[in-house]
């Protein structure tokens, strides 16, 4: 059903996008299940970068994983967005602000991330599993060290289903993003 909705959105039925399920990549928990910055009780040391330029998901994936291999960034998730852009979820390095990380990662990967940074309460539309290009096992880990107060930061985790092993840590999907 999710894949069908995304195909219809891609075909021009934009109003369906608001019906997609969401997740918060930068926060694990909100007080009283109320998604607001002031109610973020478990923000995560993560930053979701949104690359709006279409058709570059595989190139962004390859460059991101190379940067990870070089020890420059920890990549948690790479997926094609509903509108065929690319989402890259990274671990925010200690002592680096989200703004600095966004700027540095954009320079390193060679594509400009959307300058509108997402706060801890901002959501991302879920996409079908076949849009997922890479998932690190670390995406599903939440440690006391990875959380801080909502006034310091923003982001959350949760995916709709387990991902394919070929899209997990240490491997690159050879499948083309959905068209």
Feature locations, PLM:
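Short, well-ordered, mixed-charge alpha-helical segments that flank or form enzyme active sites
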Residues: 86-87, 134
């Amino acid at each position: 059903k999710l894949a069908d909705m995304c195909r219809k959105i891609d075909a021009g039925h934009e109003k369906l996008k608001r019906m997609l399920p969401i997740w918060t990549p930068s926060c694990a928990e909100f007080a009283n299940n109320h998604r607001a910055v002031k109610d973020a009780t478990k923000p995560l040391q993560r930053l979701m970068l949104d690359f709006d330029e279409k058709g570059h998901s595989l190139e962004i994936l390859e460059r991101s994983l190379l940067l990870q291999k070089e020890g420059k960034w920890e990549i948690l998730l790479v997926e094609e967005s509903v509108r065929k852009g690319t989402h890259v979820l990274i671990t925010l390095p200690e002592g680096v602000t989200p703004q600095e990380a966004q700027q540095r990662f954009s320079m390193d990967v060679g594509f400009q991330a959307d300058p509108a940074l997402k706060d801890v309460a901002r959501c991302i539309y879920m996409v079908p599993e076949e849009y997922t290009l890479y998932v690190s096992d670390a995406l599903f880990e939440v440690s006391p060290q990875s959380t801080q107060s909502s006034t310091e930061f923003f982001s959350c985790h949760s995916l709709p289903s387990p991902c394919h092993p070929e899209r997990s840590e240490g491997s690159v999907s050879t499948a083309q993003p959905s068209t």
